[in-house]
Amino acid sequence: MKDLARQRYDEACAHDRAGREAEAILCYEEALSLGLPDVRRRQALLGLGSSYRNVLRHVDAIALLRDAVAEYPDDAALQVFLALALWSGSREREAMQALARVTLESADLRGHGRAAQHYFNHLD
């Protein structure tokens, strides 16, 4: 079972790199349903969410990536791809808020974190 999940994951990545999003989506979904180790699971969730976004399935991308961020709150890449999906889904304010969170949590702002937080809180 795990070997098949890994095989489907590898196929998904190959399709993704080749720009064959529809095929990638099917393989990512199957790999995830079969069960992947934690590191591969994170990568598959990111790849699937990104592929959903690329085929304009913004609602699916946002839902999947929100769940992924809830499952892996320390994963900055998932947070960034959630922000991209939100932006593509015409939810620009939420996208900026998501980017603000990941920026404030992971970037070296050289002592300007409080100021950046203030400005992010007052974007309007």
Predicted regions and their residues:
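N-terminal alpha-helical interaction modules that lie
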Residues: 1-11, 15-17, 122
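Short coil turns that delineate tetratricopeptide repeat
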Residues: 2, 36-39, 73, 107
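Start-of-helix register in tetratricopeptide repeats
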Residues: 6, 39-43, 77, 115
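Conserved positions within tetratricopeptide repeat
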Residues: 25, 62, 93-100, 113-117
